[in-house]
């Protein structure tokens, strides 16, 4: 179990949120590995759009889940100081992306 996964489990027990980034980078890797794109430029554009729209959607989904939970339980909102490690991808998926650089940049 990686550090980011442990942080995600702790956060899910405390606040109801979930660490999406392990699953998000897994989806990116699978999309790059399974799909065969006709040109490098098209691959670059698709990855760029997917990363930003997917990242925004997952952040919005996680925020709404926390907001609904706190409002339904009528808990006073307390500002949470988020550390960089809370939303940083695990070392496993960083290693996967580093070793798949040939597929990303089409060398």
Swiss-Prot record:
It comes from the Eukaryota. Keywords: Membrane, Transmembrane, Transmembrane helix. Disruption phenotype: Confers sensitivity to the synthetic tripeptide arsenical 4-(N-(S-glutathionylacetyl)amino) phenylarsenoxide (GSAO). Disulfide bonds: none annotated. It is a multi-pass membrane protein. One of its GO terms (cellular component) is membrane. It is found in: Membrane. The chain crosses the membrane at residues 15-35, 43-63, 87-107. Partially overlaps RPE1. Disruption phenotypes caused by deletion of this gene may also be a result of a defect in its overlapping gene. This is Putative uncharacterized protein YJL120W. It comes from Saccharomyces cerevisiae (strain ATCC 204508 / S288c) (Baker's yeast).
């Amino acid at each position: 179990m990686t550090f980011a996964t442990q942080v995600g489990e702790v956060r899910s027990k405390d606040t109801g949120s979930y660490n999406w980034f392990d699953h998000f980078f897994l989806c990116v890797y699978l999309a790059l590995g399974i799909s065969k794109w006709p040109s490098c430029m098209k691959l670059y554009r698709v990855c760029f759009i997917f990363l930003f729209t997917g990242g925004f959607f997952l952040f919005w989904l996680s925020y709404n889940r926390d907001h609904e939970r706190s409002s339904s339980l009528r808990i006073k909102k307390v500002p949470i100081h988020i550390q960089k490690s809370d939303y940083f991808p695990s070392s496993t998926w960083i290693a996967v992306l580093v070793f798949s650089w040939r597929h990303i940049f089409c060398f």
